Amino acid sequence: LTVAVLGLSVEKLKEVGYHPQFVTVHVPDHTGYYPSSQQMTLRLAFQPASGRLLSAQILGRRGVDKRIDVLSVALQGGMTVLDLENLELSYAPEYGSAKDPVNVLGMVAGNLLRGDLHTVTAAELEDHLDGWQIIDVQSPKVFAHGHVPGAINVPIDSLRNRLACIDKRQPVVVYSRVGYHGYLAYRTLVQLGYKVFNLDGGFKLFSEGGSRMGIASGEAS
């Protein structure tokens, strides 16, 4: 396992006077159809007004070094998250994806910067348990194996048919395993007039130490 760090953590940035935005993504280290693909986790902090890069951290088994090098050069060059979206990086199925993890990181951060996405951290979720609805859009089988305490299970494929169980008067937090289906649910509910947040890092980050709430299990009622 390899851990790479560029600049200060989000917590340290706040201590020295920054007010960063940040995103956490989990993406394959190379194309999923090629054997032995494994997920890597990337976090990027950036300035909320300009999108200029501030710091990054990566955790993974392969390809961590080249991604942190790309981000290091981008930071030194004064690039923004919007620049990361369009970086042209080398591709071969055994080494990367058509959309490199750095591109995906930039796209998610770009959505946040443009206001197309609003996220909430596990720590922030803990402070609003009484007032927010938590929606798990994973399958019932996955939900039964583990979920955020207090969440209700509304699988992404049946979301539009189960809107009656989601109160429009209260904020909604949606999540999936790594965030992709959570984002699809986010876009669907936003377009229908709900106030929605996507859980940063998905259930993967939540369950691997992003929260003090613990993990619930059991089938949806």
What are these model-derived regions, one by one?
Residues 1, 18, 76-80, 89:
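Generic secondary-structure signature for well-ordered alpha-helical cores
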Residues 1-61, 97, 101-127, 132:
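Mid-to-C-terminal Rossmann-like scaffold of FAD/NAD(P)H-dependent oxidoreductases
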Residues 6-7, 67, 182:
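Generic non-transmembrane alpha-helix signal with a bias for helix starts/N-cap capping motifs
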Residues 24, 46-48, 57-60, 138-139, ...:
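Active-site proximal loops enriched in glycine and acidic residues that flank catalytic Cys/His/Asp
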Residues 62-81:
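A short, polar/charged loop-to-alpha-helix boundary motif
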Residues 82-123, 128-133, 140-173, 177-221:
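Rhodanese-like catalytic fold shared by cysteine-dependent sulfurtransferases
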